[in-house]
Amino acid sequence: MGGKVTCTLGEVKNRADFIIYWGGNPADCHPLHFTRYTLTPKGKHVPLGRKGRTMVLVDVRETPSVKFSDIFLQVRPGKDFEVLTTLRALLKGRPVDEARVAETGLDLAVLQDLIERMKKARFGVIFFGMGLTMTRGKHLNSAAVLSLVAELNAFTKFVCMPVRGHGNVTGADVVMRWSTGYPFGVSLSRGYPRFNPGEFSTVDVLVRRDNDAALILGADPGATMPQPAIDHLASIPTVVLDPKVTHTSRLARVHITTAVTGISAPGTVYRMDEIPLPLKPILRSPYPTDEEVIRRIREKVKEMPAWLPASFAAVPCA
C-alpha cells in the first residue's frame, strides 16, 4: 500500500456517479454532506443530480442514512475486513470460497454485483467512517479500503476519503504528516518519529496504561474513548485546554480555559478533504489562545533542569 487515492469534495460534487458510505451515518453525523457534495447537488459532469448518482451504504445495522441509499449491505459486526478482501479477490478474478463469504452476512452474488457496479462507474468514491476504522481490524481495515481503491483505478477512476469526526481532526493529521512523515500513531519518545498504529495510537497507549501524564487540546476523549482509557486518564495528571467544560475537563487535574478558535482566536482548520480554511476572529476574548498557553508551558519546561526519577538513578559500583 502506498498511500490513498483521493480528491476534493468539489470533484466529488462535479464528477462522482457512484458513492459508497462504509461504516458511517452521514444523515446524522454530517447532515449537509448529501446536499452539498454527494447526492442531491447537480455537478458539471452529473447534470441530473440525484438521478445521476447511485449510493451504496455498508453498515452493521440500519441507520437513518438507509432511506437515502439505493443499495444497503448489512455486514456482520467485525467482518468488514473479510468483505473488503473478498472484493479485492473478485476484482482480480481470483477464486472465492462461497461458504467463507456467507460468514460476512452477505451472499457472494451480492458482492459480485457490487464489484461490477464499481468497475462500470465513471467516477466512484468510498467514504469510510469510524464504523470501519475503530472496529475489529482498525488500521488494517483502512489499509484494505485504500488498496481496493488503488486497484480499482486499473478499470475506472475511483477515490476514497475518511469521514472525520468533530473538530479539526483532519488538521491534526495533516500537520503531523508534514512534520513527521506519518499521520497518526507516532511516538517521539526516542527523539525521532516512529510510526506503529496499534502500539502508539492514543487509545492503545491509554488502555495499556503506558503513559503517566496527558495533555489534551481541544478534544474530548472522555466522551468517546473506551472506559479503560477514560479510567486511566482520571488516574493520572491530565491537563485539558478547552474553551468549554467537557467530560474530559471534569476528570482532569487542570483545565485551562482558552479562546475559541475562529471566533476569538485566529487559526486554520482543514476540511475532511484536507483543504485548509483560514479562520479570522470576530470577537475579543479574555482568555489566551491554545498557542499562547503551549508556548508558555514550553518556556517553563526549558527553564527546568534536567532530571531523572530516583528509580533511574545510577547505582554505584561495588
PLM features: residue spans?
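Non-catalytic alpha/beta scaffold blocks inside enzyme catalytic domains
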Residues: 1-155, 179-318
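Short, conserved secondary-structure transition motifs
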Residues: 156-177
